């Protein structure tokens, strides 16, 4: 195991964030009849998992549960942790491992669903590179060191006997958009991206005037297919979903309404991809409606309730535990994490 698998800088930020743990928990009321909330704040990253949340906010999908619904974006996992622990949002889209880690460290987190099962690709200038092994010896730009999607990449590399540090030159960058910019400006030839950054990169390099100077880009290794091949499982990874934090967890009617609305909004986004893209582009800088529509077409999205996703999550978590238990807070999350008794 490499110490680099867990970013010391990120770990420090997590510890700093844990100082805020008591706030949302102290504010949580005892279980009882839920009154209509004045506001529900939804939050998510510039990724496809946020599309249903944005639709929910724009269409008033939770009007029976709250007087107002708003969406706010988080830019990186450290900001996500601070928002979750500081009471800055009620329902957040987040990587599955982050949700489990927060729960195991005592944060008030209830996973509602896993909805993103396939959104990770290596984007490359070389159309002939189709598996991770094809990138041996190459430099790859990777966002969010020690977090999703870096942890999936490292699992898949080590599973096939490759050393992430010796066999590759991993260039860590703060965000997926920065990895994409390195690709477009020819400063790297390969980058690990999630949707819709993948589709955005492919569209940008084919558009005027960027296309005059940018390289031709291709979808290279499909990390979902690599997962299925290496682990002899379905080619899907429980990458991200939505979780409730703080006081709203004590209102089961609200949680049920959120889960139902998310599933309906996801179905709407699949059926109305371009309009969904227009909604996302209004809330998240750099995204275009067309790139979001492309991303919806290729991503594996399925709003699986947390209890039904538990088996696949625990397999994924087991691989992370074997690699670095600290990624999950040292143990598998208990049944309460999944909203079970």
Task: Describe every region a protein language model picked out.
Residues 1-12, 23-27:
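N-terminal secretory signal peptides
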Residues 35-173, 189-195, 214-220:
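Short, glycine-/small- and polar/acidic-enriched structural segments
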Residues 51, 82, 86, 100, ...:
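Solvent-exposed, polar/charged alpha-helical surfaces in well-ordered, non-transmembrane soluble domains
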Residues 56-59, 83, 138, 156-160, ...:
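Structured segments of extracytoplasmic/periplasmic soluble domains
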Residues 63-65, 227-232, 302-309:
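Short, solvent-exposed loop/beta-turn-alpha elements that line the ligand-binding surface or hinge
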Residues 97-98, 177-279:
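Pocket-lining segment of extracytoplasmic ligand-binding domains
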Residues 247-323:
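Secondary-structure end/capping motifs
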Residues 314, 318-341:
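Conserved C-terminal helix/tail region of periplasmic/extracytoplasmic solute-binding proteins
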């Amino acid at each position: 195991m490499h110490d680099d698998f867990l970013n010391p800088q990120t770990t420090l930020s997590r510890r700093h964030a844990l100082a805020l743990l008591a706030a949302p928990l102290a504010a949580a009321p005892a279980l009882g009849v839920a009154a209509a909330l004045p506001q529900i704040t939804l939050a998510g990253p510039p990724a496809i998992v946020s599309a249903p949340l944005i639709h929910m906010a724009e269409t008033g999908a939770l009007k029976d549960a709250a007087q107002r619904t708003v969406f706010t974006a988080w830019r990186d996992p450290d900001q996500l942790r601070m928002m979750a622990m500081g009471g800055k949002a009620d329902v957040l889209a987040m990587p599955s491992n982050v949700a489990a880690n927060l729960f195991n460290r005592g944060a008030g987190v209830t996973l509602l669903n896993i909805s993103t099962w396939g959104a990770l690709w290596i984007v490359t200038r070389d159309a002939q590179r189709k598996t991770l092994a094809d990138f041996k010896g190459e430099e790859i730009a990777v966002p969010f060191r020690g977090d999703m999607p870096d942890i999936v990449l490292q699992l898949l590399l080590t599973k096939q006997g490759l050393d992430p540090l010796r066999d590759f030159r991993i260039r860590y960058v703060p965000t997926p958009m920065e990895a994409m910019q390195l690709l477009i400006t020819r400063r790297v030839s390969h980058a690990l991206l999630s949707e819709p950054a993948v589709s955005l990169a492919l569209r940008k390099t084919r558009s005027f005037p960027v296309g005059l100077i940018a390289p031709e880009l291709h979808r290279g290794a499909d990390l979902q297919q690599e997962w299925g091949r290496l682990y002899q499982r379905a080619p899907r990874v429980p990458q991200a979903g939505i979780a409730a934090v703080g006081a709203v967890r004590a209102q089961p009617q609200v949680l049920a309404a959120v889960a139902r609305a998310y599933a309906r909004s996801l179905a709407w986004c699949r059926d109305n991809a371009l309009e969904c893209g227009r909604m996302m582009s209004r809330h998240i800088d750099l995204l275009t409606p067309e790139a979001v529509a492309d991303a919806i077409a290729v991503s594996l999205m399925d709003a699986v309730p947390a209890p039904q996703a538990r088996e696949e999550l625990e397999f994924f978590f087991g691989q992370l535990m074997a690699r670095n238990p600290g990624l999950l807070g040292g143990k598998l999350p208990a049944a309460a994490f999944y909203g079970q008794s």
